[in-house]
Amino acid sequence: MTELSQNDWASHLEADPESIIIDVRTQEEVEEGMISEALHMDIYNGQEFISGLDKLDKTLSYYVYCRSGNRSAQACSIMDQLGFKSTFNLVGGFLGWTGPSVTP
């Protein structure tokens, strides 16, 4: 796992068009807004979260965020243990995000 500031996160995403963004917040949090094109996978859903991860291509880069950066760091750690090659955590999470977002 690599910790990225908002600026680094944006530049890494631009340079890696095959990458995937994952939002690990709760459904209630997501309803307040989310980063465009993010895949929602609630880390609090336990086995459902793990099952969802098992369906993903472990060779791609994953940019993970939550509300403040703690749950996404946990998610990146889990992903690393499952054999994902490249995970990035957004420091400060969605609270610090000033980039484009959408309301589902």
Residue ranges of predicted features:
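Rhodanese-like catalytic fold shared by cysteine-dependent sulfurtransferases
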Residues: 1-20, 27-61, 70-104
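Short, surface-exposed ligand- or partner-binding patches at beta-edge/loop junctions that are enriched
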Residues: 65
